[in-house]
Amino acid sequence: MGQKINPTGFRVGVIRDWDAKWFADKADYANQLHEDLRIRKYIEKNLADAAVDRIEIERSTKSRVDVSVHTAKPGMVIGKGGSEVEKLRTQLAKLTDRDEKGRSKRVFINIVEIKKPDLSAHLVGQQIAGDLERRVAFRRAMRGAIQRATRSGAKGIKVMVSGRLNGADIARIEQYTEGTVPLHTLRADIDYSWDEAMTAYGNLGIKTWIYRGDILPQKKNSK
């Protein structure tokens, strides 16, 4: 089962938390879900060069939306004197539904810095995709990503690239693995991502698994 299922979804509720934290009744659920999709799509499009890994959305009340942006380049997102993050907050507020009085929801943005981007599967996948789009040999791009992740402290990494590699007429799959990637172990902190590279010969799929160690449950002190 661990070989087939998405490693991130497999561990939600065990060692990972949801990226969307809110509850809604039947009447409001669809509207809030589409709000989330608009917010995520806008951030991914406008901060494509800011190395954004995750976007967390939390709603404590119906009129408040808290957005946490995990990025390896916080300075690019914040801007000089916080100008860029204020522009982002204003634009995200316009994407929310208005209340009965025509007012937009209050949006609060929290920037979370990723100190080791080479341990983020999504950022590693984006790096490989960028190399492939710049016509770097796929083996060189994959091995370079594996070496950087290993130097950053990864216990294991697996990278898989599929498609018309090097412009071949027949599509195929190539993969490299370094260390161990225990997909069946729920306590194993495995980050997974699927990315896409758009080349002159077609799109290439990139799957990345990074094993960052185990997350053990904390023991509760008995009184």
UniProtKB/Swiss-Prot annotation:
GO biological process: translation
Domain of life, per lineage: Bacteria
Domain called KH type-2: residue spans: 39-115
Keyword field: Ribonucleoprotein, Ribosomal protein, RNA-binding, rRNA-binding
SMART domains, sorted: KH
GO-annotated molecular function: mRNA binding; rRNA binding; structural constituent of ribosome
One Pfam family matching this protein: Ribosomal_S3_C
GO cellular component, one term: cytosolic small ribosomal subunit
Gene3D superfamilies noted in UniProt: 3.30.300.20, Ribosomal protein S3, C-terminal domain
Task performed by this protein: Binds the lower part of the 30S subunit head. Binds mRNA in the 70S ribosome, positioning it for translation.
Subunit structure as annotated in this protein's UniProt entry: Part of the 30S ribosomal subunit. Forms a tight complex with proteins S10 and S14.
Family: Belongs to the universal ribosomal protein uS3 family.
Entry protein name: Small ribosomal subunit protein uS3
Organism for this UniProt entry: Leuconostoc citreum (strain KM20)
Designated gene of the protein: rpsC
